[in-house]
Amino acid sequence: MEFSSHHIRLLQQLDEQRRRDLFCDCHIIVEGQMFKAHRNVLFASSGYFKMLLSQSCRDMGEPITATFDVFSADTFTAILDFVYSGKLPLSGQNVIEVMSAASYLQMTDVISVCKMFIKSSLDINEKDRDGFFSLSDKDTGSNGSGLYAAGWRTENSPTHTHETAEHGSFIAGYNYPPPITSRLQRPFSKHPRKPELVRKHRRRLLPEPLTPAPLSHIPLGDLVGGSAECMLQDEETVESVSLEEERAQAQETIIITKEEDEDVASHSWPESPQQESLEQGSALHIAKAEELYKAMPTILGGASGWGEDEISSGRFKCPFCTHTVKRKADLKRHLRCHTGERPYPCEACGKRFTRLEHLRNHFQTIHEAGKLICRRCKLPVTKVTGRVIQDGTRRYRLCHACLAEAGLDNVNFDYGEDQPLVLPPENEREQCWNFKEEERKENGSEQAESDLVIQEVVDSEEEELKQKQD
């Protein structure tokens, strides 16, 4: 059998031990204030403490002391209460500080809850806004409540008045959250709207009236190391949320073309300066928290169990860094960056490379670009193993073996690099050097035979003419 309330009672007992200072073996100092806790609870709740305590696991007899200067004592009090009770008191004043501290301590669950809290307060879509501000005559003068509404309300929150053309009802004294501004409260633009768009927009602005319900403390699910407590509504509010989902599905059947959507977007109302300043301030706090989260040290051994769910089963992770690949061959190639292995040597110069394509590119650009070949044996030749030969106006290169066969191996080659070896005239060359002499003789003999034939024909014609004249 499984008892669902066992872990709740266990957390309560641990929290009671912490408050009575029983078996506390970890001391945390923040702004000069000391907090006492159990290292096992901190180890299971925070990636930072997991790394810190795993390095000092040998000194189990003495208590561990850690000092933090990156967040305030009130912020750490809220986080420590969350660790031991599963309840996170979030509000518009402390959500950024709590998120920054959770980022530093590597508490991913608290970060996700803070992001959801901020998103719900800033990025409410049009459907939720219209459903939130469209109330019936029965709700006149009543106070509404929404998700995390208690955390946003302040004593100086302004009252809003709203009149609807459909019902003609008047709502006064409604305590709205400061970051949210209704579209119906903004002044209309100068451009008139199309009648069809107005009718379709009215159909979207007529949801069922919402009945406000008393607020209660409900934890947001079972998270690792606890859960965040936020202000939610009772069962009636849950039913109203389900009704809103059904109406949202019905509203999806209304087809609005792309041009109409662009027209509606072009006729939007300007935002109030109060909302713009609040959104800019929140955006700056969020960016600061994200930068702090990116600046955290990377933990390999201590925090190896954190974030493993984000890596799919079909990926391979590098044991030296956070790089992940899809194929095992890519991981093997990536490991050469850490090991320094270069398994691909160049046969021409002996230089080694980590990747085969780098070797191929090196060979093509260095060794095969302007490749020199011996004119006689057709083998590769360099400036060291060959010599440039000039035969009249023609220049080519021969290797030392071919030069030795031609009898030019004793010639002094101490010339400049640009000065070629000039061959002697044809009548002074040796027969072994003139390797095309046979071809020239054959061509010359053929030409001589043709000349003889032509000469014989010419002589025979002249004799015939002389005989006729006689």
Swiss-Prot record:
Any matching Pfam family: BTB
Zn finger (C2H2-type) location: 316-338, 344-367
Stated name of the protein: Zinc finger and BTB domain-containing protein 8A
Species this chain originates from: Xenopus tropicalis
CDD domains assigned to the protein according to its UniProt record, in alphabetical order: BTB_POZ_ZBTB8A_BOZF1 (cd18329)
Residues of the BTB domain: 24-92
GO molecular function, one term: zinc ion binding
PROSITE patterns hit by this protein: BTB, ZINC_FINGER_C2H2_1, ZINC_FINGER_C2H2_2
Keywords: DNA-binding, Metal-binding, Nucleus, Phosphoprotein, Repeat, Transcription, Transcription regulation, Zinc, Zinc-finger
Free-text function comment from the UniProt entry: May be involved in transcriptional regulation.
InterPro entries recorded: BTB/POZ_dom, SKP1/BTB/POZ_sf, Znf_C2H2_sf, Znf_C2H2_type, ZnFinger_BTB_dom_contain
GO cellular component: nucleus
Subcellular location: Nucleus
Native organism taxonomy: Eukaryota, Metazoa, Chordata, Craniata, Vertebrata
